[in-house]
Amino acid sequence: MVTGNTKAETFYSMKELLKETGGYAIIDGGLATELERHGADLNDPLWSAKCLLTSPHLIHTVHLDYLEAGADIISSASYQATIQGFEAKGYSIEKSESLLRKSVEIACEARSTYYDKCKDDDDKKILKKRPILVAASVGSYGAFLADGSEYSGIYGDLITLETLKDFHRRRVQVLAESGADIIAFETIPNKLEAQAFAELLDEGVAKIPGWFSFNSKDGVNVVSGDSIKECIAIAEACEKVVAVGINCTPPRFIEGLVLEIAKVTSKPILVYPNSGERYDPERKEWVENTGVGNEDFVSYVEKWMDAGVSLLGGCCRTTPTTIRAIHKRLVSRRSLFSSSSSSSHH
């Protein structure tokens, strides 16, 4: 059992965490939209990483909101935080690296604050001492470009495997050494970038494991048009990858994708979809009323778990309310899991 700031080495295998949490674990929800709700201005290529500079206390608040809603895994505000991105803003390499470290430290501090709060009782919050993992979020090269290419996966012929490895190497290293338990390689838009991440892990750039999560806009392939099965096969072959799945994708596509993924992986499957709202890249805003409400989002949860999902949460436009609703749904599922696993021991 992990307490306080103890590193979660016991969960080098994601399977151990899942055993502790009754077969299903909850990932947090959207960070950027919550930060905006708390008053942050994210109109910037750095997006939520801007708050590392301007309002770290808001990031801490949002992490804590998710833990109190029942999340078992919280992700750092580093999705769009890159050394190159900070340098473009005029920051030194040292300052850029310290901001990456800070993103993980804030999440670790929120976990400690949460553990302290677990001594109190509050009916409205889930205050339960449990293993909580801090995931260091790594967005794609396209997320750094902030030109929408993370949603197309088309980087052009000039971007090679080596370009991508060089781009991510130091960032992954710094995040891995900052106290995180796992690296979340998120919204991976193509096979080439998955290969780059896998090779960095194989080369020992990070001492901690990672998860690979892809995005899809058609429910069949990843956004670049690469086959989801081929992308998952890259993750499957990498020993340091401890879970695979889908994020930043409309809920209606998830079940079909998971059924495909389950055919080619033995690793735990994770999903954290968007609310389903459409993003308008021209206007840089979400189109209201194009998504599903919390009830509808949660109504999908059973189907996803039946299809083989073990870790679930939300991505863009999902909130602590979404996560609390998932937690409620999982409580009954977890009790079934524990009764069936105890009966299977006789």
Swiss-Prot record:
Q: What does this protein do?
A: Catalyzes the methylation of DL- and L-selenocysteine with S-methylmethionine as donor. Also methylates DL-homocysteine, DL- and L-cysteine in vitro. May be involved in selenium detoxification.
Q: How does activity track with pH?
A: Optimum pH is 7.0.
Q: Name one GO molecular function term.
A: S-adenosylmethionine-homocysteine S-methyltransferase activity
**Catalysed conversion reaction:** S-methyl-L-methionine + L-selenocysteine = Se-methyl-L-selenocysteine + L-methionine + H(+)
Tissue-wise expression: Expressed in roots, young leaves and florets, but not detected in plants not exposed to selenium.
The record's listing under NCBIfam families reads:
PRK09485.1
Task: Supply the EC number(s).
Answer: 2.1.1.280
Query: Looking at the Swiss-Prot or TrEMBL record, what is one Pfam family this protein matches?
Result: S-methyl_trans
Q: Which residues bind Zn(2+)?
A: C248, C315, C316
The record's induction entry says: Up-regulated by selenate, but not by selenite. Down-regulated by sulfate.
How is the enzymatic or functional activity of this protein modulated? Inhibited by L-methionine.
Q: What is this protein called?
A: Selenocysteine Se-methyltransferase
Q: Which organism is it from?
A: Brassica oleracea var. italica (Broccoli)
Q: Tell me, what is an example of a GO biological process annotation in this record?
A: S-methylmethionine cycle
Cofactor names: Zn(2+)
Arranged from A to Z, the UniProt key words for this protein are: Metal-binding, Methyltransferase, Transferase, Zinc
